[in-house]
Amino acid sequence: MLFKPKENSNELNEKKIVDHIRCLGIDMINEAKSGHPGIVLDAAPMLYSLYGKHMKINPNDATWFNRDRFVLSAGHGSALLYSTLYMAGFGLELEDLKQFRKLASLTPGHPEYKVTPGVDMSTGPLGQGFATAVGIAIAEVYLRNYFKKKNHDIIDYRTYVLCG
């Protein structure tokens, strides 16, 4: 299971993990005095399920080529993504979450690729992420078929997108 309790803590059940994701996200928004709490409260179970049960990912190697991809097309919900990445062990620390929406932080107002470990695409305007996720999925199919013709079965990732 991807979500593991932090050191010196008891085993966490699914509901508690989802509640932790929600509380962290809401605390981030409250501390920044800016953000969108609705998506944090509503979509936390979806991200928990994706990251904890379905996605093929490795928090220790967030750029592994054959990993599944997740695109938060509703980029304004970044507090949800960051709190999920924190709970899943992608290298974010509580101090990073406290720096939410601050200049030069690992947790900017909208997800930014190559800034935050585990963010597969920079998003902002609604709909931008959806179109790019379609392109990522098409690229996967193309690469899988290209390498299969050469008798190499090495590409088999999936692309997930949350639209808002």
Identify what each model region corresponds to.
Residues 16, 35-41:
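Structural motif
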Residues 1-14:
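Basic/polar N-terminal segments that are highly enriched at the extreme N-terminus
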Residues 12, 37, 123-126:
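Conserved, non-catalytic sequence blocks in retroelement Pol enzymes and Pol-derived host proteins
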Residues 29-35, 116-121:
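Active-site flanking loop/helix segments enriched in acidic
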Residues 42-164:
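Cofactor-binding active-site loop characterized by glycine-rich and histidine/acidic residues
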Residues 18-34:
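N-terminal capping segment at the start of a domain
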